[in-house]
């Protein structure tokens, strides 16, 4: 269910801003998006797993807060990140 270390490292390398970046908002959003996608697939197979559904809603909320932070700080980076991750955003 959780991300494998190798998958996590690939995501970090793809979305990092510099060589030692592991925790920037962009990296956190990318990691959360990957976990959200995995959990969504799990919930399609197991619709009565309400604890996982709650966890999914919490992850979506955390990702939304991070995206709002990025949008306020740098709208250009926000649009680029949303496009790369295929995240729908309000216009």
From Swiss-Prot:
Database matches in InterPro entries: Ribosomal_uS15, Ribosomal_uS15_bac-type, uS15_NS1_RNA-bd_sf
Domain of life: Bacteria
GO biological process per UniProt: translation
Matches recorded under SMART domains: Ribosomal_S15 (SM01387)
Coiled coil: none
Positions of disulphide bridges: none
Any Pfam family: Ribosomal_S15
GO molecular function, one term: structural constituent of ribosome
Entries under Gene3D superfamilies matching the protein: 6.10.250.3130, S15/NS1, RNA-binding
One term under GO cellular component: cytosolic small ribosomal subunit
Annotated signal sequence range: none
Keyword Ribonucleoprotein: yes
UniProt entry tagged with the keyword Ribonucleoprotein: yes
Keywords: Ribonucleoprotein, Ribosomal protein, RNA-binding, rRNA-binding
Role played: One of the primary rRNA binding proteins, it binds directly to 16S rRNA where it helps nucleate assembly of the platform of the 30S subunit by binding and bridging several RNA helices of the 16S rRNA. Forms an intersubunit bridge (bridge B4) with the 23S rRNA of the 50S subunit in the ribosome.
Subunit and interaction comment: Part of the 30S ribosomal subunit. Forms a bridge to the 50S subunit in the 70S ribosome, contacting the 23S rRNA.
Protein name: Small ribosomal subunit protein uS15
Organism: Synechococcus sp. (strain JA-3-3Ab)
Organismal lineage: Bacteria, Bacillati, Cyanobacteriota, Cyanophyceae, Synechococcales
Name of the gene: rpsO
């Amino acid at each position: 269910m959780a991300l494998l270390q190798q998958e996590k490292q690939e995501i970090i390398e793809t979305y990092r801003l510099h060589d030692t970046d592991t925790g920037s908002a962009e990296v956190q959003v990318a990691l959360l998006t990957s976990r959200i996608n995995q959990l969504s697939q799990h919930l399609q197979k197991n619709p009565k797993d309400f604890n996982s559904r709650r966890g999914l809603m919490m992850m979506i909320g955390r990702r939304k807060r991070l995206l709002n932070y990025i949008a306020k700080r740098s709208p250009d980076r926000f649009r680029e990140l949303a496009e790369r991750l295929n995240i729908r955003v309000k216009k």
